[in-house]
Amino acid sequence: MTALEHFVAIDRDLLHAAARRACERIAPTWPLDRMIAVSPLWERRDQAWQEVAEQLWRRAGSRLTLDAQAYRQALQEGHLDDRHLQQALDEAGSSWTPAQLLHLLPAQDAEACGLPLLEDMADAEIALPGWPTLITQQIGQCCAAWFDEAQADWRPDRSEGLYQAWRAAMLQDRGLSVLSACAELRQRIGELPMQPQAALEVAVQRLGLAADELDEWFDCLLLRSLGWASWCAYRRWQARLQGDDDDSLRQLLAIRAAWEWLVDDRLRHAGSRWSNWREAWQAARSRVPAAGWQALMLCQRAEELAWQEQLQQGLRRPQAVPAQAPELARVYFCIDVRSEPLRRALEQACPQVRTGGFAGFFGLPIAYTPLGTAATRPQLPGLLAAQLAVSDSSGDSQRDRVLAERRQKRLARKERWQLFERLPASSFTLIESTGLGYAGALLGRTCGLLQGAGAAHRAAWRAAEWRALKPALAPLALTERVQLAARVLRAMSLTRDFPPLILLLGHGSQSANNPQAAGLDCGACCGQSGEVNARLLADLLNDAGVRQGLAEEGIELPDACRVLAGLHNTSTDEVQVFIDALLSAELHSAWQQLRAALDAAGAEVRRQRAARLGLQPVAERPQRLLAALRRRVGDWAQTRPEWGLAGNAGFIAAPRERTRGVDLQGRVFLHDYDWRQDEDGKVLELIMTAPMVVAHWINLQYLTSTTDNRRFGSGNKVLHNVVGGHIGVFEGNGGDLRIGLARQSLHDGERWVHRPLRLSVVLAAPQAMIERVIAAHQVVRDLVEHGWLHLLRLDDDASMPLERRGEAGWQKLAG
């Protein structure tokens, strides 16, 4: 039998349709400099949650729950109760009792294996590292070289596609034959077709796969290289935003399929490698989850019910009584869960302050290009495409040109030095000649005496130069600026009763030596600080011409009202406010009160966070605690500068009066919404199709990174090595590209800080309004009806229980 002899005939249209379906199931991962939280299961939302959970268990050995011990511990500590287990059992229609359910939990965390591939059968026949590791490593190195556009000084030939580059690299790599103990490997590589589509066809035909096996087989192949598959999906996502497409994911699938053909020993007798694989493959395909797996899924649902019960108890208490004194200021935060404790503390420190929640990009569909650079970055959710351009300006175009040229020269000098550092001849002589000069800085950074270089968009600026600049929109007609401002204010439910001061707070994080730092910044700003958006909107709303136009739209901002912008540092809970012009005497007094309240609120939140960060000894000493946090965020060795969005579990869109004073433990996204000001339901539609979806992405990234960090997370942060300058990270020196969150972002070394619960969305709106949005949008319908999140309704009567939308319609929540 020759190498290219067809083993089985198959319909090519069916084959390529199955390949397309497999590729469409892969969700994108964003690069490090735009690292946003993404659900790795986003493209599977057209299936039910339970169905996807079972598929992942069968195909990849992945689960969407914690292990049994975690749920036993939750019961022992009182976070979970028998009544929650019973509610979960009743909901599933199970005849088990809570005692039987607990008895069925696995005694130990068994290693699930998923569907076997041919490489697994061949693994035992070669020495370490083994075929699966060797294949993943080889594909990873090839993809890293192919996609690199920023780090390597040498890159492979890109005149053709990824598959062709991989095939050419394989032909040149003689070490593979040695590592695999397969002398004929190079000959087999030469027999591979030149085109990826043909390689897929040949692999399927030679391995004897039937049409009804292709969906599972292709899915298994891509799940083995999920990191690079997700990067290819990102390239496809970006191309489609521009009306184009990208086929690198199909080519990666062809590479994976070709490897299966390469490890085939070409024998077909009983006991051969192929025969053993076919037997194991068919047996695994017919396997159903054991009772222990079902018990884990029920425990996870019980924990969600326990959380919803706790949430309902807080929301059903008497509503907060508004302060009798006039409103001093209104402070708008991003809906990020880290803003909830600061909002609560701020309102407690100064009851005359009211807080609001809105997506941190503040409704501005912008892309930002820092002055003096060509590095444009999106400042809006990954779901959307930018429509407006923003840069920095001093207000004087001539001065802007001078500043831009000055910065470009500084950046060019720095780039030339970095190029010299990378030269092969510099590897030893550079250290010998200049190493001692770095000693002071090295010791200073190690001891926390020196801070890092700061935010990238401030690089190569002197402090005075940076202070002279502020974000500025590219020329835009006044009518367009008015319409933009009006849309944002209506979405914020901010169209009347304006206080003297309005403060728009973006947020950003601070850490050192952290490739995934953007993952701690504002997800609504595509992994960037929200400073640009906040300052831009404040400037827009303070513009006299825009205010006049808003008045014609029925939104009258009083002359005495001033809009300010600021930045919430989520790592230290310090708040910086940007004041570009002098305030009037009346506003200055209000500002001083607000500033004092912000400082007091920050101190209180730091005190509350101290224990989780291991700083309990200085929790009651505000200055020492702040100093410790500042040192912590500048510490090169700190793997947990902050906990990010760990613990997120809920999303509430309601008037602030419904949540004011409720301790939501920093676990809830809070979005201001008043359905009485939303006559046509457009604001609710926007909330359910944008912020709610973004919150779901965040929630699922944290959930999957916790339940299966090996596949959906990025492993040990200490071992991270950056790939391609900004693409992502390897754990160690190779393997698959790692996606998701590092274990240190979810686990404190003793226990999980994040509990994997699907998002509970609470909307304060009539049923009919909610149902209209669900009916109009397939994405929302998939999330709600397939169980990817839980949808609940908050009644205007605070004493009424929450209503949950389930298969039988809206039903009152127990508890």
Curated annotation (Swiss-Prot):
PANTHER family the record matches? INORGANIC CARBON TRANSPORTER SUBUNIT DABA-RELATED, UPF0753 PROTEIN AQ_863
| Record localization | Cell inner membrane
Q: What is this protein called?
A: Probable inorganic carbon transporter subunit DabA
User: Could you tell me what this protein does?
Assistant: Part of an energy-coupled inorganic carbon pump.
Query: What domain of life is recorded for the organism?
Result: Bacteria
A single cellular component GO annotation: plasma membrane
**Organism for this UniProt entry:** Ectopseudomonas mendocina (strain ymp) (Pseudomonas mendocina)
Chain's gene name: dabA
| Pfam family membership, one | DabA
Q: What HAMAP family does the entry give? A: DabA
